[in-house]
Amino acid sequence: LDMTKNQITKELNRQAVLFEQKCKQGQCVDENIRFTDLSEMWFTDYAENNLKKTTLVSYKKMLKVVLPAIGHISIGKLQPHNLNTFYNMLLEQKIGCNVTCHSDEDFKNYINVHNGKKYDKPRMSQNELAEKSSVSIATINKLLKGNVISVECAKKICETLGLEYKKVFKETDRSTISPSTVKRYHALISSICSFAVLQNIIPINPCTRVKPPKVNKHEADYLDEEETTKLLNTLQTEPQPFRTAIQLLLFTGIRRGEMCGLSWEDIDFDHNVIRIKRNVLYTQETGVYEDTPKTATSVRAIKISSHVIGLINDYREWQEEQQNKCSNQWRESKRVFTNALGVPLHPSSVSKWFARFNQKNGLRHIPLHSLRHTSASILVMNGVPLNAVSKRLGHACAATTSNIYSHVFRMADEMAAEALDDVIFKKTSENHSA
């Protein structure tokens, strides 16, 4: 059949739409599938069933940056230079990644805050706004305090409140993208391409021919002996439950989420053992949720001293007193760490309390996770074998522990060399003197 130029163009467009629909339905998948469509397949068929929720949330955000850059490219034509160009654009801040915004508008005019003031207009409650906009309460609180929030959240809030985004918000400068962040983008793209290889869509993962930027290794930050002693002494006058929570993190090296996930049944008072079975995490998208520990080896039993058991017993007495005081208001959760009403501790509240505690007492500011590093460094410096330290921390392998604390192991090795010198030369000099 002879077709006019317009008819040919129309038919080609129709076939393209049909092909795209088949690709999305999994009926026709080959190397011509666009990276965008492949990423949707990967997310549904692999990611949702195999990745942790925190990783999924992070990857969703990252895909919003990846897809505008390379989503239009068919997977069979995705070349190393496409990826290198994308990574360089990230490093040079030429891509809208990590863009935030702030507003000089007083959002208390639109959001209900119990501050005693009267307002002319009816206002929406924070919970209602969070539900309608799909923005977390934490983000709304940041907005009310005048802090920056993501552009995406700001636009959702404006749409819900009937405000014009460009009139209310001003975008801030894009924050710098570090090489380690670029490496995470590389890992995401590589995972999608590996999925394509496994599905026989392409023969080779193009990411294997690309070297992401070199990441400078940062030493784990931890407290020295003097700082640790000062921290413990200062904690003694602090209130429960934080006093015991901080000490437990230091003495066991467990992660924040593992501590928040502890139930009373996880503590064996007869054998001085804590069993790590779950992890409590928080994301803005999902709120607080319970998950399995980080890795399979993170499910573990940790031996603790009689001193630590004593701390936990004292804390349990405090919790029982609070339960008796609150009576019907007490919220039974069976969790170890709760507030005075029995509500399980929010992971972020522990970190925020620790930051305020350090500032109030003139202690060096360190993130809460550094207590884990401090615990590990104390073990290493006191000659505890690498495998024992690794098992206690719940690392997947001893090499992970060795890499994270390589500088601590070097220091311990130097101390061992000096100790050896002291013993040998002392005996040698004594023999010569004799």
Task: Tell what function each PLM region has.
Residues 1-85, 89, 95-109, 113, ...:
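N-terminal DNA-binding module of tyrosine recombinases/phage integrases
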